[in-house]
Amino acid sequence: MKVILCLGGNPARLDTAITLLQSTPDSTLIVSSESPVETVLGKLNDAGIDPLRYIIDETAWDTVTNFTNTVPLVKKLGTTELLVVTDGFHMLRAMCVGAFVYFKSGVKLHPHPSSPHDHSESWSLVLLDTARAALYRFTNQTLYDQTVYNDRIAIFYNDYYRGRQVSTRMSP
């Protein structure tokens, strides 16, 4: 089974993730985003995606936490392949972060840009987030206060269950 990890809920990224999901019947989509759950659900429901084929994670607030916060979900799904969806300009940073977070996990990352790679992010940002991912890999810390994480994980579970209820009501 493949897992598609969509970093953020912007329309182009979601469109790419939905296309991948539709073309890969044995896959599950994880949307890791701060976008309102209703916006993401609307896009998924409009595309006719079965609610059992996706998980929405609203606990991440940056690239590092997009990966670190979804590790337990990816492990639970038992995948060996993670298809990473983000903008082309963001892909280098995403793949560097993902490589550290999933180092020696048996999960292979595959880039799937939602837009052309027409420019890159600053090297300082790539290096900073890669260093934070390395720190996470060896210490399980992301340089964020634990209380912030605890607050966000509670929101995630509330929104996850609310999202399931909303998607059930919105299904035809």
Place the predicted regions along the sequence by residue:
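A structural signal for short, hydrophobic/glycine-enriched beta-strand patches
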Residues: M1-L127
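Short, charged low-complexity intrinsically disordered segments located at boundaries
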Residues: V71, W123-A131, Y160-T168
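A transmembrane-helix-recognition feature enriched in membrane-embedded lipid enzymes
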Residues: S122-Q146
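Charged phosphate-binding loop/patch that engages nucleotide di/tri-phosphates or the phosphate backbone
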Residues: N140-P172
